[in-house]
UniProtKB/Swiss-Prot annotation:
Pathway: Cofactor biosynthesis; pyridoxal 5'-phosphate biosynthesis
Quaternary structure note: In the presence of PdxS, forms a dodecamer of heterodimers. Only shows activity in the heterodimer.
Protein name: Pyridoxal 5'-phosphate synthase subunit PdxT
Keywords on record: Glutamine amidotransferase, Hydrolase, Lyase, Pyridoxal phosphate
Superkingdom assignment: Archaea
Gene: pdxT
Family matches, as PROSITE patterns: PDXT_SNO_1 (PS01236), PDXT_SNO_2 (PS51130)
The organism of origin for this protein: Picrophilus torridus (strain ATCC 700027 / DSM 9790 / JCM 10055 / NBRC 100828 / KAW 2/3)
Keyword Hydrolase found: yes
Binding residues annotated for L-glutamine, in chain numbering: G50, E51, S52, R107, I134, R135
């Protein structure tokens, strides 16, 4: 199984290093995607957290290939800014979502960098997870997605058939269970 981390900007290396320890258990190889053509070789891709306006500027080269592959069954995971990119409605004209997930999301809803925090979130099929929220977005409307976890009554991790989006950063915790959940989704389990 090949998992690619979109190497535009943000926590690229952190996701890459989160996948690598799972190599033997899931027979997975991690790659950093530097060109749109590499997406076609992957079984799943991760859009990392970072700055959503920056990611949007460079995403245009990748968007058609990503959308086509996801329509054809490829699995995708977006964290923080990656969740914004997967959304249908970003609430910000500078940031264009792909519409892969039927969610309405609000950028930087928890405040500025100084307002970042870690708190426990109970995630369906995973359990209690210490989630890292950094200038995190809020999912205002989960649409037709399944809500896997909430924080203060708002969805923070949702999924549909081919995608998982979360407003926190699992790659910064050392806890690999969210990445394992994604790998099982890629495998069809």
């Amino acid at each position: 199984m090949k998992i690619g981390v979109l190497g535009i900007q943000g926590d690229v290396y952190e996701h890459y290093t989160a996948i690598r320890p799972l190599k033997n258990k899931y027979k997975v190889e991690a790659y950093i995607i530097r060109s749109p053509e590499e997406i076609n070789e992957m079984d799943g891709i991760i859009i990392p957290g970072g700055e959503s306006t920056t990611i949007t500027r460079f995403l245009s080269r990748y968007i058609n290939i990503i959308n086509e592959n996801v329509r054809n069954g490829m699995k995708i995971m977006g964290t923080c800014a990656g969740a914004i990119i997967l959304s249908k409605d970003t609430g910000d004209p500078r940031v264009h979502g792909t519409g892969i997930m039927d969610i309405k999301i609000q950028r930087n809803a928890y405040g500025r960098q100084i307002d970042s925090f870690i708190d426990a979130v109970n995630i369906k099929n995973i359990g209690t997870f210490n989630a890292v929220f950094i200038r995190a977005p809020v999912i205002d409307d989960p649409g037709k997605t399944s809500v896997l976890g909430e924080y203060n009554g708002k969805p923070v991790i949702v999924e549909n058939e081919n995608a998982i989006a979360m407003t926190f950063h699992p790659e910064l915790t050392g806890d690999l269970r969210v990445h394992e959940y994604f790998l099982r989704k890629v495998m069809g389990n």
